[in-house]
Structures are given as C-alpha cells and as structure tokens.
Amino acid sequence: MWRPAQGARWHVPAVLGYGGIPRRASWSNVESVANSRRRPVHPGQEVELDFAREWVEFYDPDNPEHLIAADLTWLLSRWACVFGTPACQGTVAGRPNDGCCSHGAFLSDDDDRTRLADAVHKLTDDDWQFRAKGLRRKGYLELDEHDGQPQHRTRKHKGACIFLNRPGFAGGAGCALHSKALKLGVPPLTMKPDVCWQLPIRRSQEWVTRPDGTEILKTTLTEYDRRGWGSGGADLHWYCTGDPAAHVGTKQVWQSLADELTELLGEKAYGELAAMCKRRSQLGLIAVHPATRAAQ
C-alpha cells in the first residue's frame, strides 16, 4: 500500500467551502484530449523528476498573513487525466484499466468521511457496480494504518477501489462517485475523497517566521509527482504527471483544475493566481514542463 510522504495532508479547511464556486452545466477534472493538436507520444516514457521550475509568490487577498507560492511550470503545463485511454498505464503493472484507483483512498478527517457517506446515499445500482457489496456488513471502508495511526480508507474489492466500476459495467467504467457527480451536475470534488480530487495537485502548508519575528502561513502548490507518495512512489508501475502522453490537454492545468484550485485556495486567491498564470502564459514561460515540451 502506497501512502503520501509523512506530514503530507489532503485536508481542506472548513472556511474554503464550495459555495463560492461558480455553477456550471457540468464539472470534470478529466480534460478533453480528443481535439489535441499535439503529436502522439508512446506512453511510459516519463521525464526525470528533477528539472527547472518557475514560481510566483503572492498574498491571499482575504488574508495578508497568508503567503501562497505557486509552481507555474506545473500550472501552465498541459497535463490532463487520460484515464480510459491507451495512454493510461495504471499505477500497478497489469492493471491499466484501474488508472490510479488500484488502492483504496485514505480519508483525511471526519468531514471527508461524512462527505463520502452522503455521496454513497446518492448512488444507485445503475451508478455503482459493487453497491450491493459496499452496503453489506463489510461496508465500503476498512481500517488501515497511516503514519502509525489507525485511519480509514475505501475498501479494495477484486484488486481495486470498491468504487471503481470495471470495464463492461452497463453504467460505464471509472469512478462511480465521479460519474454520479457529472450526472447530477455538481463538482466531483463534492462527492469524492479529498485525496482523489486533489491529485495531482500537491498542497503543503507551514508556518514561517520572517526576519522581523512575525509569522505567516505559507501555502505551496506544486505537482504531486512520484516523490509525493514517499519511498513507494519509485515502485509505481507508471505515473501520469511525468509522462508526455498525459500532457495533451487542450487547457493548461490552472484552467482545467480551476474548481479544485478554488476549493484549495478560496475564490479571491484563485482569481489572483489565474490572472498571474494568464499573464505569464502570454509573456512566455521559460521553464516549461519537460513532459509538456516533449508532447509538443
């Protein structure tokens, strides 16, 4: 079982509710790649983990004591979720149809667990292939251990997350929670566990003491690459963020993951970030993500 590196958190502060997200006809963090003009790249050729990145820092408009550091190399990349296409190799060898769902998702806190329970109540047999299994005595959660502490995660069933509908299911393959959210016209992040909707964004937070002795909260947004999974990340069969075959999005990450970034930062802070990303894109990025460059 792979877990995030020690100290990594997926917790979303309660003050960053979803109420500020503009309503749309539908939401998805699966970026369309059908009309991409980028040349096809053979899947599995991942770039090295270490390369030049460009960063920008700015203060949260709603909190002058909150500094945000954003990785422009990642946010201006053309990464896109390629689940369900030949480009997705799966994190476990021999299970490409699982994508990154071969392992159950650890739940970050009670709010995460409550949100999942509410989502489960909305699922029908037409939405969820293993609904009957998930609602029986064993349930859809199991107790595991993370950082030496007991922690719940979604149960594995037949080699993958119990919420993963397999190929051949009449309701369609893929995450039952994600698909149901799209049917209901709500953001998938309102129905999925934190770790699932935040990937592949990595957010870390720390208190920083400035030279004058004052403290500020620093939030860092960057790519959740293999190292984010700790020592087990190197053993993943395949990981999408470093593969040019997954850098085929018609939009840049700051646009395609706008809902997720808004939830993590707040509406005003995301607005600032979006303006900076747009301007940097117009000026031309110096440190282009090597996977995006290789896909061009």
Curated annotation (Swiss-Prot):
<comment type="similarity">
    <text>Belongs to the Rv0495c family.</text>
</comment>
<protein>
    <recommendedName>
        <fullName>Probable redox regulatory protein Rv0495c</fullName>
    </recommendedName>
</protein>
<comment type="function">
    <text>Essential for maintaining intracellular redox homeostasis. Could help overcome various host-induced stress conditions, ensure bacterial survival within macrophages and modulate in vivo growth of M.tuberculosis for long-term disease persistence.</text>
</comment>
